[in-house]
Curated annotation (Swiss-Prot):
Organism: Alkalihalophilus pseudofirmus (strain ATCC BAA-2126 / JCM 17055 / OF4) (Bacillus pseudofirmus)
Quaternary context: Forms a stable energy-coupling factor (ECF) transporter complex composed of 2 membrane-embedded substrate-binding proteins (S component), 2 ATP-binding proteins (A component) and 2 transmembrane proteins (T component). May be able to interact with more than 1 S component at a time.
This protein's name: Energy-coupling factor transporter transmembrane protein EcfT
A Pfam family matched in the record: CbiQ
Localization: Cell membrane
Source taxon at top rank: Bacteria
Record gene name: ecfT
Bilayer disposition of the protein: Multi-pass membrane protein
GO MF annotations, alphabetized: transmembrane transporter activity
Function: Transmembrane (T) component of an energy-coupling factor (ECF) ABC-transporter complex. Unlike classic ABC transporters this ECF transporter provides the energy necessary to transport a number of different substrates.
Length: 266
């Protein structure tokens, strides 16, 4: 299940989003991610959900791939929803399950936060799904260029963020392998109280971190063997080109953001 997480994965394609400059995608998604937290009503929230679904359709990423990738996230969304339903005591009581009273405010807040969380994940995934690792690194480096004036290494920061994003699927695959190995040895992760399940998961941390550090070391050695010495003096085979489509996308994101802020204040 974990190996299907879509964050950090790239799907090769020829869609409108794939052809955009990575900088325009990064700027637009960053604007929309901020605006999500300004959307404090259902109309604004559903508007962002509709926009996200439309962008996913434009990306032409296979629906089955999206479903498999979002399935692990749905457990977190469901957990968030249940937590709000159980802990929020606002509004009239809808039903009572033994000692637990379910309030209207809890259900509405839970659905609202769950929708926001799912939108955040889908928007973040759009960047990596439609942007190759090289383009993503180049785009981040270009956006970080002003940081050079204060002595920060723009290329190294961009490379670090790109590697971190791409490492997520690998990390999830490693978690899945270790889980299956432990289950083959008779460890039960699916039954018993929550405290017992958490204790059963703790032994996974050591091999998981060892594997993560081993992969990081292998990557560092591979980069060093290929002569990587940082971004200073490096040239690029492909130069990023900003055009009218990129300006349109960024301006559209700004207009949507301003509209949602006006709805909030209105």
């Amino acid at each position: 299940m974990f190996q299907n997480v879509i964050i950090g994965q790239y799907v090769q394609g020829n869609s409108f989003l794939h052809k955009l400059d990575p900088r325009s995608k990064l700027i637009s998604v960053f604007i929309l991610l901020i605006i999500i937290f300004f959307a404090d009503n259902w109309f604004s929230s559903l508007l962002l959900v509709g926009l996200t679904v439309m962008l996913m359709a434009i990306s032409r990423v296979p629906l089955l791939f999206l479903y498999r990738g979002l399935r692990p996230i749905l457990w977190l969304v469901l957990f968030t929803l249940i937590l709000h339903i159980l802990l929020t005591k606002e509004g009239p009581v809808l039903m009572t399950l033994g000692p637990i009273a379910i309030h209207e405010g809890g259900v509405m807040n839970g659905l609202f936060i769950a929708t926001r969380l799912l939108t955040l994940v889908m928007l973040t995934s759009l960047i990596t799904l439609t942007t190759s690792p090289i383009d993503l690194t180049d785009g981040l480096e270009s956006l970080f260029t002003p940081l050079k004036k204060v002595g920060l290494p723009a290329h190294e920061l961009a490379l670090m963020m790109s590697i971190a994003l791409r490492f997520i699927p690998t990390f999830m695959q490693e978690t899945e392998k270790i889980l299956k190995a432990q289950m083959a040895r008779g460890v039960d992760f699916s039954s018993g109280p929550i405290s017992k399940r958490v204790k059963a998961l703790l032994p996974l941390l050591v091999p998981l971190f060892i594997s993560a550090f081993k992969r990081a070391e292998d990557l560092a050695l591979a980069m060093e063997a290929r002569g990587y010495r940082g971004g200073e003096g490096r040239t690029k085979l492909r130069v990023l080109m900003w055009n009218g489509k990129d300006s349109f996308v960024v301006v559209s994101a700004l207009v949507i953001g301003v509209g949602i802020i006006l709805l909030r204040n209105g």
